Every structure is written in C-alpha cells, then in structure tokens.
C-alpha cells in the first residue's frame, strides 16, 4: 500500500535534515496516515479509507463525508474514492427524479 491519502492525494515528500553545522542529509517526510471508517448518509454504507489527519478534520469541517467527497476534485481522489463519489452521484440523481 502506498503512503498516500486517498482523499487529498498527499504523499511522501523528500527534503533534508539540517544540523547545527548546516550539514545536510536526505530524509523523507511521510504523511500522518490513519485508516478511518467514514459513513455515507446517502449510500448508507461504511467505507474504510487511508487518509491523513488533516483530511479527517477537513471532512468534519465540510459537514460530513458525503459533502466533502462531492466537492473534492477527481484528480486527487484515489480510484476507490472516485468509485464511491460516482455511486453517491448516481443515487442522488435517482432520488431527484
């Protein structure tokens, strides 16, 4: 499994450790990933996704999982998240008819 958030696309960054004497050594900055269960009110299902800690706060701020994923850009979503988003869109379209 890659070290990448499924909702925001945040992945590993590379940089330097810099000592007091300005000696630089390469290092990795890994995202704070957590495996979290999100409940969709529209599909009435529970989804387990690997997301970073900031994304969890963003989902809560957006008003829930459904609202967040509908506003999210498809370019940063994983294939699993895109499939969930499409399922939510399809159900909302059927309900609006």
Swiss-Prot record:
Matches recorded under Pfam families: Ribosomal_L28 (PF00830)
GO molecular-function term, one example from the UniProt record: structural constituent of ribosome
Biological process annotations from GO: translation
UniProt keyword Transcription present: no
GO cellular component, one term: ribonucleoprotein complex
Keywords: Ribonucleoprotein, Ribosomal protein
Record family assignment: Belongs to the bacterial ribosomal protein bL28 family.
This protein's name: Large ribosomal subunit protein bL28
């Amino acid at each position: 499994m890659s070290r990448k958030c499924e909702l925001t696309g945040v992945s590993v960054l590379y940089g330097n450790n810099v000592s007091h004497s300005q000696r630089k050594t390469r290092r990795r900055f890994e995202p704070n990933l957590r495996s979290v269960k999100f409940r969709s009110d529209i599909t009435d299902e529970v989804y387990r996704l690997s997301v970073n800690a900031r994304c969890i706060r963003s989902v809560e701020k957006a008003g829930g999982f459904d609202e967040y994923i509908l506003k999210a850009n498809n370019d940063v979503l994983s294939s699993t998240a895109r499939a969930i988003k499409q399922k939510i869109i399809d159900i909302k379209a059927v309900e609006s008819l």
